[in-house]
Amino acid sequence: MKFQYKEDHPFEYRKKEGEKIRKKYPDRVPVIVEKAPKARVPDLDKRKYLVPSDLTVGQFYFLIRKRIHLRPEDALFFFVNNTIPPTSATMGQLYEDNHEEDYFLYVAYSDESVYGK
């Protein structure tokens, strides 16, 4: 998926910002969250998050669901590198395994469990 954040900010800027965030907040991880193409869920009001490393993916789902005002019966799926992460993993684990060279973790969200292009 093409992330708008990457389109809006050149790599060097993102890398410098990612490094600065990791130094200043070692117990938190920088995450970019954007809606997947063709997803029929609302847009987020912001896409950059600084998340506690020990927050679980399940807790992060809850946080994002609240921000986009999803009803309990509405489905929501996260994708990290085109894969749905386990809800029991911590955001710190997910970050360590999947962050990009700019020190950001990129998460796409959708109402579909299949990653659309």
UniProtKB/Swiss-Prot annotation:
Q: Which residues form the propeptide?
A: 117
UniProt cross-references to SUPFAM superfamilies, sorted A to Z: Ubiquitin-like
Gene Ontology BP terms: autophagosome assembly; autophagosome maturation; cellular response to nitrogen starvation; glycophagy; mitophagy
Fill in the PTM field for this protein. The precursor molecule is cleaved by ATG4 (ATG4A, ATG4B, ATG4C or ATG4D) to expose the glycine at the C-terminus and form the cytosolic form, GABARAPL1-I. The processed form is then activated by APG7L/ATG7, transferred to ATG3 and conjugated to phosphatidylethanolamine (PE) phospholipid to form the membrane-bound form, GABARAPL1-II. During non-canonical autophagy, the processed form is conjugated to phosphatidylserine (PS) phospholipid. ATG4 proteins also mediate the delipidation of PE-conjugated forms required for GABARAPL1 recycling when autophagosomes fuse with lysosomes.
Keyword Ribosomal protein included in the entry's annotation: no
What CDD domains has UniProt attached to this entry? Ubl_ATG8_GABARAP_like
Query: Where this protein primarily resides, as one coarse class?
Result: cytoplasm
User: Superkingdom, according to UniProt?
Assistant: Eukaryota
Q: Which residues form the lipid moiety-binding region (Phosphatidylethanolamine amidated glycine)?
A: 116
Pfam families in the record: ATG8
Q: In which tissues is it expressed?
A: Ubiquitous. Expressed at very high levels in the brain, heart, peripheral blood leukocytes, liver, kidney, placenta and skeletal muscle. Expressed at very low levels in thymus and small intestine. In the brain, expression is particularly intense in motoneurons in the embryo and in neurons involved in somatomotor and neuroendocrine functions in the adult, particularly in the substantia nigra pars compacta.
Q: Where is this site: (Microbial infection) Cleavage?
A: 115-116
Which residues are tagged with the site Cleavage? 116-117
Q: Where in the cell is it found?
A: Cytoplasmic vesicle, Autophagosome; Cytoplasmic vesicle membrane; Cytoplasm, Cytoskeleton; Endoplasmic reticulum
What residues show lipidation of type Phosphatidylserine amidated glycine?
A: 116
In its UniProt record, a GO molecular function of this protein is: ubiquitin protein ligase binding
User: Subunit structure of this entry?
Assistant: Interacts with ATG13, OPRK1, RB1CC1 and ULK1. Interacts with TP53INP1 and TP53INP2. Directly interacts with SQSTM1. Interacts with ATG3, ATG7 and MAP15. Interacts with TECPR2. Interacts with TBC1D5. Interacts with MAPK15. Interacts with TRIM5. Interacts with MEFV and TRIM21. Interacts with WDFY3. Interacts with the reticulophagy receptor TEX264. Interacts with UBA5. Interacts with KBTBD6 and KBTBD7; the interaction is direct. Interacts with reticulophagy regulators RETREG1, RETREG2 and RETREG3. Interacts with IRGM. Interacts with DNM2. Interacts with NCOA4 (via C-terminus). (Microbial infection) Interacts with Kaposi's sarcoma-associated herpesvirus protein VIRF-1.
Q: Which family does it belong to?
A: Belongs to the ATG8 family.
Q: What is this protein called?
A: Gamma-aminobutyric acid receptor-associated protein-like 1
Record the organism. Answer: Homo sapiens
> What taxonomic lineage is listed for the species of origin?
Eukaryota, Metazoa, Chordata, Craniata, Vertebrata
